[in-house]
Amino acid sequence: KVLNRIFVILALGAIVFVIGYAVSGMKSGGLLRNRFSFDENKNVKVLNRLNTDWVFPDEYFLEIVEVDGIAMEWIKKKDTESDKVILQLHGGAYTRSLKDNGTTYRRMAVQYAKISGASVLTVDYRVAPKHPYPAALEDALLAYRKLLDLGYLPEHIIIAGDSAGGGLALATCLYLKDHDLPMPAAVITMSPWTNLNYQRRKPAYVGDNRADDPYISPYYGEYGGFPPMLMQAGGDEILLNDTLHVAKKAEEAGVSVQQTVYPGMFHVFQALFPELSEANTAWNEVEEFITFIFSDK
């Protein structure tokens, strides 16, 4: 039952914040309650209100493009052409599309643009079960190559993602490294899902492949040669070890890793900005990291 709840939570990605409740139930030694109403969850209500009340800012414009059949969303500041870009990979357990996630990732894309001064490209990558691995990875790589084709320098690109998108960001960089392709300037992950290797139930994204393939589960990857990484996680989330393990491996491989665990926080709590003070603190950290990465480029 607990494992099933994990998949439900991941599938809803940043839209459902019940991880904190789930972890508290597991830590107490008991199973989750049978009665489990997402609508009654305070964090869900806050996020729904934030998304409903949000108005796209006048100083930015949205452009939806299609690259080889894959939809992507550009967020750019009007009358400004930045040579820096953030490639955002959304969460949702590899089963929820960008459209399924509603306004959440458009809000986050604008937030990335505001704090960085960069343009932001969000990929509506194909999702399981119709499109298992390697579909999402192929689409992330397609977007990255498109940025290079448009003239963006690798050192001017940051790949960012949350939950499944965080794992996908790491998998994308693992692929780039293994194939001697240009690496981005940095990677940012929020509550990344890095280990899909479950004994009892196989995630839909795995398909007929091995779940311990590093391109599916970056938990098993080798991180030597990676760019600087900022990894954030909530202290009370089920996926905490998905961050801690990868951060440790990367640090041992000589990678510059800035890892922050926010006590008492849940899965992808950052999406509750500006309502939640911890979310605002996390975004301030992201801003400082991006400023540092782009400062000499």
Task: Indicate residue ranges for each PLM-predicted region.
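Alpha/beta-hydrolase superfamily serine-hydrolase fold, recognizing
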Residues: V18, V23-N41, N48-K297
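N-terminal Sec-pathway targeting helices
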Residues: K1-I15
